[in-house]
Amino acid sequence: MSEISNNNEYIPRAERRNKDGLTEKEFLEQYNPGHYERPSVTVDMLLFGMSRDLKCLKVLLIKRNNHPYIDCYALPGGFVNITESAYTAACRELEEETGLKDIYMEQLYTMSQPDRDPRMRVIDIAYMTLIPIDGIKPQAGDDASEALWFDITFNDEILTF
């Protein structure tokens, strides 16, 4: 609805009514969030590392210490807590699983395929960064048994790491 009434008077936000005649307060009092299923939200971090001489490009992977995909390599990541932003969760998970902190990351992509996680409906927000890796040694922690840099190699047909 408009914030201006029919006689051109300003209507304060708290007094504005929707098509059912409800103010925002009345609407929220009767609102039932249980009408919608709740997906979980996770974050993953894609960390590229470059040597200072620019001759070596690597990607940081962790070895999962638990199901699903136990003993498989994956991007560092985990669940977003209800009280934190996705970026805060990304920073927390990166430090918990690799020991790395104070690394600036950019949001890259949101993955929302309904069956992408075997546990439940999960929406994942991926972050990415490129950092100099000379002298940076990740330390596995939390639910990661390893945290390692893998070389990225290019050939005519595929990218491998």
Predicted regions and their residues:
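N-terminal leader/linker segments that precede catalytic domains of diphosphate-processing enzymes
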Residues: M1-F161
